[in-house]
Each structure stands twice: as C-alpha cells, then as structure tokens.
Amino acid sequence: MTMANQSDMKVHDWLAHPTRRSYHEANFYPSLDPAQLPKRFVDGTDMNLFQGYAITKQTASPGNIEPLLDHIKNIWCNGDAVTYEYTLNWMARVVQKPWQRTRIVLVLISKEGVGKGMVTDILGEILGSQCFLSESRKDNLFGQFNSSLSCKTLVVMNELLWAGSHEASGVFKDMITDKAITVNEKHQVQRQEDCYQNYAICTQGPWAVPASCESRRFFVLEPSDRYCGNQDQESTQYFNRLATVQPKHVADFLYKRDISSFIASQVPETKALTGQKLESLTPVQSVLYEALIEGHVFCIDSGGWDKMGNPYQTTGHFGASLQRSQILEGMTQASAQMRSDKHHVPQKFWRQLKSACTAKGETILHDQGRVRNSSSGVRAHYMRFSPLDECRAFWEKHCFVPPGGWPQETDENLVTPESANFDVFESADPTKSP
C-alpha cells in the first residue's frame, strides 16, 4: 500500500500501528449523548453510524411557526384537538427521542394538493438526509435490496397502495415493530442493523394501510380538501404563508415540546382508521359485519330452489339455533368473493368465522353439536350466535364502531311506489302532465 508523501506501508504495518482504530461491528443508534449511548459505543467496541440530525437542539432557534401549526390543526386534523395534540407529540418524539420508536404509523389520506408534503419535507430538513427518506418505489422498501432503509428514523411512503397484497402487508407490519433489520446492499455482504425507523404514509388511495380489526399500529387522518385543486387567490396566499415557516423554528418548537406524558400506543380512534379497517376486512368478516348491520344471519334453505335456479334465501335470528350447513351456504352466497374463490372450502370458512367471532377469551359463536329436531325428527349440526345486542357490543369492543352507529329500528312504514296512492293520475290524460 502506498500513501501520498509517505514511504510504502504494508498491511501488517497498518494493522500493528498503535493508533489504528478497530471495531467489533458497525451499527446504528440515533444519539450522540454519551449518557444515552449503550456502553459498546462509548468504550469503542462498536462503531455508531449515526452522524446527528441536520438541525440540532443547539442550532435550532425560536420563530413564528403559526402557519404550520394552523395547517396541522385545521387541515390535517380538521380542527380536532385530540388528534392535533397526538400529531405534534408524535413528531416531537421522533425529533427528541429517536432511540424510542413510536411503533405507530402516521397515515394521511387525502386528495392531491392539501399540503401533506410541505410538513413532512420540513421534518426531512430537520432530520437530514442520513435519517430521513421519502420513497414512492415499493421495491426500495420491500424488495430484495433495502439499503435505503439503513440509518433512518423517519421514512415517508408516498402513494403506496396495498391492493390486497398480503405479502407486502405482512412485511410492513413486521417492519413497524422489528428490533433489527437485515440490510442488503448490492455487491455487499448482508448485515444486521438495529431498527429505529418511524413510518408515515401519504396517499390519495382508499386503501392506504392493512389495518385489521385488532390493529393498533396506525394513526389515520383524512386532511381537509379546503385548499386542494386549482389554486385561487385565497389558496395561493395560504400556501405562500405556509412556505415562510423555517425548519429551524419548527425544530426549536419540537425540541422544547413537553412529551413526558405522551404514550404513543394510546392512538386516537379516528373515522379514517375505521374506514381502513372496513377496507381490510376479510370476506368472512365482511359478511358477518353486514349481518350485524342487517340484524339477521344469512342462511340458505336446504328445502329447494326457486324458478331461476337460485337457492331459497332465508334469514336466521341472532340468538337462535341454526343449522350449520345453512349458515355456511348462506354466508358463502352473500359474498361474491367467497363464491369465486376456487380454494374456498368449508374448513377454511369455519376457521375464519370462528376467528372473527372470538377475541380475548370471548366468543359470540356457539357450537351446539348434532341434535335432533323435535318437530321433524331429523338430526343435524346446529350453531348459535349470541343475541344481536351482544354480537354488536362484541364487534364494537374488538373491531370498531360502525360509521354512524348501528341502524335503529323504527315502527314507521316506508313509503314505496307500490304503497303510494297514484289514483289521481290514473284517470288523467296520459298526454298531459299532471
């Protein structure tokens, strides 16, 4: 090895040099404070790849950020105080304590042009290019080569839709909570790196996240579309004012914000999150939810077929004993997706239905076994759902409250064309308007 202005130096001479620095491994821990760093980084055993945020607590300075706060409160959060406070606390946590992951994904679903990116871009300027990533290519996040995720504390995913991709959904759920990531860079040896990524998703699509009924990983907002679309004088002035906010002033606000009582896992339940759960329902869950909305169980009468060749559709009452075969046929017929699924078999249906009806030791589906019908004398396998009120309460507790609540029963008669009185028109001249 030849070094400039120096005599030839062999590798073994460099290895034997008393001031040569060596490490057991290189890893990532987002702090430069010796009091906060793990011992292996302080004593030099491991090399810390973290270089510090672009705007530190020392380089941040106070200034006017009211346009930004107003935007987050009234556009992002539609004036809701609870979600506004949570949003600011979530951001402050990423800035103040990046070594403590929120493990909660911030999701923004809206039309184009509402100003989602203006806020995340400011966060990116605070964190710097080493720790911030804004990505719209799915392969760079979930593909074979993922080195772009290395050393990141905030990853913003732009316009990434799941569209039923269970594989990507499973990978992403693991990424949110995993303690370590395998970094795979082209032409390099794979290595393990500790995870400190927080995630945000900005999208226009209806299905933004794979939010199952029991999901607690997502904080979902639907920003107002007040200023989106073609820009007029009002919206132009609004965004020009927002653009005057300086990242160093936002950094000062976030560094100084008190988050001592913030618990990231206590995510506000939003209507937008409920919408994502509805989008993510499995076919069996969807049919069960529709049955709870309608107030009866979908069944198929095994007694025959109508003139069109369709099986007789009957309704079963919640709380009543129903034949197992009739429930299977009725719910399958109620779901076009299940009807078209070549791999849909009874065993799969019952496994999914029992899973949908059971949570934390509670169940609303009861197997009564094979019993003889006292009137017909026929022995059949019967199941029973809990009463409707109990089933709806179970769904609210373990899934979500339906948008607008459950339908209310009423004694009022619905006026239909068949029941309306058209006698006044029957004797009128059909060529003249009544």
Regions picked out by a protein language model, each given a short descriptive name:
Residues 1-63, 67:
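Conserved glycine-centered beta->alpha loop in an early N-terminal alpha/beta scaffold
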Residues 38-156, 163, 168, 219, ...:
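P-loop NTPase catalytic core of nucleic-acid-dependent motor ATPases
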Residues 112, 261-434:
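DNA transaction DNA-binding modules
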Residues 145-150, 184-202:
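AAA+/SF3 P-loop NTPase mechanochemical coupling elements
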Residues 153-176, 208-215:
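Conserved AAA+/SF3 P-loop NTPase catalytic/coupling segment centered on the Walker-B
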Residues 161-162, 204-208, 224-229:
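Conserved nucleotide-binding/hydrolysis micro-motifs of P-loop NTPases
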Residues 169-191:
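Conserved catalytic/switch belt of AAA+ P-loop NTPases
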Residues 193-197, 211-281:
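Phosphate-sensing "switch" segment of ASCE/P-loop ATPases
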